[in-house]
Amino acid sequence: MSHIIKIFPSNIEFSGREDESILDAALSAGIHLEHSCKAGDCGICESDLLAGEVVDSKGNIFGQGDKILTCCCKPKTALELNAHFFPELAGQTKKIVPCKVNSAVLVSGDVMTLKLRTPPTAKIGFLPGQYINLHYKGVTRSYSIANSDESNGIELHVRNVPNGQMSSLIFGELQENTLMRIEGPCGTFFIRESDRPIIFLAGGTGFAPVKSMVEHLIQGKCRREIYIYWGMQYSKDFYSALPQQWSEQHDNVHYIPVVSGDDAEWGGRKGFVHHAVMDDFDSLEFFDIYACGSPVMIDASKKDFMMKNLSVEHFYSDAFTASNNIEDNL
C-alpha cells in the first residue's frame, strides 16, 4: 500500500510504499531529502513529523510531533514532514557505470588513493562533496569523491579498516585495469552558494570531500575566506600536502592541521580538531561550516559550535559510519 508524503516548507509531495523507507521513496521520486549514511547512525536525515504515523526498523511507532529518521522510517499513513529538500540536486539521476583502476597508491600506513577511469560516455555528474557506492566482487561500500570534476575520472581515499570487506580487497589484490562498478552520485553534502567565510572540518579521510570542494572553489576563483582544519591522531597520518600548498598559493586559504594523539615529533596544534576552531574564533555566527568525519566528531562539533553562535542552518555535515555499506569510509 502507498501513501502520499508531503514535505514542508517546500510544499512538494511524492508517494511512498509501506515497505520502503521515506528516504528511499523520496530518492526514487527524484526528491533529494537531506541524508548521509542511510543507516540510522549519523542523524543527518532527522525530520519533524507534522502529521501521520510511521514505523521504524525496530517496530517503534511515531506520530505527530515526533522527530524521525527518514532513512529508517516507513509510512503507515499519509504523512506531512518538515524536512530539508535540495532543488540543486533535482536534475541528478543515480546510475551505475563500469570503471577500471587507473592507479592505487599507498599514501600513508593505512590510506590508499584509488583513481578510477570511466568510459567517456558514462559520467555520473556529481557535485563536489558527494559520494559514490563502489561495487566489487559482491561487496558494496560508499566513498566520498576526492576530485572536483570527472575530466580525469574518479578519485577515492580508502582507509584500510581491520576486517573491512572492501578495504581488504582493495589493499590485498587490486591491480591496474581491475574492473569495478560505481553508483552515484549520492548524498546532500555540497557547497551552498553564499558569500560567508567557510570552515572545513575534516577527520581522517574526511579530507576527501573537502579536497573536492576546495579544488572546486579555487578553480572558480572564489574569494571567500576558507579555513581548513584537518585532524589526525598522529602527524605521520597526514597523507596530502595539498592543503599547505593551497594556503601558500592563495591568500584566502588557511590551513590548520591538528594532532590528537601523543606525538613527540609534532610541534603544531594539538587536541580535538574542532576545539582548534573554538580556540580561533570568538563567534561563528557569520560562518558556513562543512564537517566530514566520524559521527562523534560531527555531533560534538555541532553542539560546541552552536555555543559560539553558529546557526544550525549553516552547519553541513557528512558522517563516515562503520555500519552497513560504509564501514570502509572511516
UniProtKB/Swiss-Prot annotation:
Binds 1 [2Fe-2S] cluster. The keyword Methyltransferase does not apply. Coiled coil: none annotated. Pathway: Bacterial outer membrane biogenesis; LPS O-antigen biosynthesis. Residues 3-89 form the 2Fe-2S ferredoxin-type domain. [2Fe-2S] cluster binds at C37, C42, C45. It holds the Pfam family FAD_binding_6. CDD domains: fer2, flavin_oxioreductase. Its cofactor is [2Fe-2S] cluster. GO terms for biological process: O antigen biosynthetic process. Gene3D superfamilies: 3.10.20.30, Nucleotide-binding domain of ferredoxin-NADP reductase (FNR) module, Translation factors. The keyword Cell inner membrane does not apply. This is Protein RfbI.
